[in-house]
Design a protein with these regions (language model features):
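Flexible, P/S/T/G-rich "lid" or insertion loops adjacent to the active sites of thioester-utilizing
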Residues: 159-182
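Non-catalytic N-terminal regions of enzymes
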Residues: 1-161
Length: 182
């Protein structure tokens, strides 16, 4: 990797910038009321990856470009306090651009912002936690705000919404009218 992309999970990551710029990794912390069982967490994570294929990607650098590539290896789960990867380029992450770790009653998901925004990763984490609770034997269900792992995946979920911005009426000039509106 060049000096333009130093993939660190510890807040020292800078994409196309220097140490004075913002980090490109975010963390979602989920606190549960019981201690986390890594066996159930690993199983829930494996099942969640089938519902969220858009985050099953890694990064490869060639010439002057960085390109996403599909990753199909198991997603590792790390216990906080034990040696963990500090870079997204660490081989222990199996090529993924996110890290899942836990400590007592807390679940941590660190991810590269090129992978998804907070809304997209929050949908993944909610589905992961719901499945974890189901595997743990709790009678939980969703009110519709959590994507079920059995739900259908739509291609638009993995697309950049900014690319569809031109289709929105608000991005058209004031004088623009749609003939179907009348």
């Amino acid at each position: 990797m060049t000096g333009y992309l130093v993939p660190s999970l510890c807040g020292q990551t800078y994409l196309y910038g220097s140490h004075a710029d913002a980090s490109v990794s975010s963390r979602i912390v989920t606190a549960l009321t019981m201690h986390i069982d890594p066996t159930f967490l690993t199983q829930a994570l494996a099942e969640a990856m089938t519902r969220f294929p858009q985050i099953s990607v890694g990064l490869v650098e060639s010439d002057e470009r960085r390109t996403f590539i599909p990753v199909s290896a198991d997603v590792p789960v790390f216990r906080v306090g034990e040696p963990m990867p500090q870079d997204f380029s660490d081989s222990r992450l199996n090529g993924y651009l996110f890290r899942v770790s836990y400590c007592h009653k807390h679940l941590y998901v660190d991810y590269h912002r090129a992978l998804a925004d907070e809304v997209g990763m929050m949908a993944f984490v909610k589905a992961l936690v719901l499945r974890y609770l189901e595997l743990s034997g709790f009678p939980v269900r969703t009110d519709g705000s959590v994507k079920l792992l059995s739900g259908e995946y739509f291609k638009a979920e993995g697309e950049d919404p900014m690319l569809r911005m031109e289709d929105a009426y608000s991005s058209k000039p004031v004088w623009f009218m749609v003939s179907n509106a009348f």
